[in-house]
Regions:
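ATP/Mg2+-dependent ligation/transfer catalytic cores
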Residues: 1-134
Length: 134
C-alpha cells in the first residue's frame, strides 16, 4: 500500500511508534539506518534529515560529508522484532545534497534513472524478492 506523508505521521501518532529508522544502501549494497524520533518526522518529510556521509563507504569521504535523507512514505513497514513496548517503523530514503540536487551515488536514484531510461527505449521491468535458506 502506498502511504502519503500525512498518513504516516497520523499512523505514528496513533500507534505508539517509538522511533523510525530511515534506511538507505551504500554503493556496495550495505544497508545503513539513521533513527529518528516521531517528533522529527514532519521535518524529515519537509526538508530531509542530515547525516554524515563521510562514514559511509563509497560515498566520497569528507568531500560529500553533508547529505540529506528524504523518507519515501510508500516504503513504510513495521519492523517485527522489537521486544519492548512501542513500535519501530522503517522507510527507505532518497539522498540529496543540501541544495536539493540528487546524490549521484544514491542507489535508489541510480535504479530510478535506469528504469526510466529503459522505459524510454520500450523496455519494462518486473522486480520481486526471493527468500532463500541454506
Amino acid at each position: 500500500m502506498k502511504y502519503t506523508p500525512e498518513e504516516v505521521i497520523q499512523f505514528v501518532q496513533e500507534e505508539d511508534v517509538k522511533f523510525i529508522r530511515l534506511a538507505f544502501c551504500s554503493v556496495y549494497g550495505k544497508q545503513h539506518n539513521v533513527a529518528i524520533m516521531p517528533s522529527e518526522l514532519k521535518r524529515a518529510f519537509a526538508y530531509g534529515i542530515a547525516f554524515d556521509a563521510s562514514a559511509v563507504d563509497g560515498f566520497g569521504g569528507e568531500i560529500r560529508s553533508d547529505l540529506l535523507l528524504h523518507p519515501d512514505p510508500s516504503t513504510l513497514i513495521q519492523l517485527p522484532w522489537r521486544p519492548e513496548q512501542g513500535k519501530v517503523m522503517q522507510m527507505f530514503c532518497d539522498i540529496s545534497y543540501p541544495d536539493g540536487r540528487p546524490f549521484e551515488r544514491d542507489t535508489r536514484s541510480i535504479l530510478k534513472r535506469a528504469v526510466a531510461d529503459a522505459g524510454a527505449r520500450g523496455v519494462q521491468f518486473a522486480f520481486g524478492a526471493e527468500m532463500e535458506f541454506y
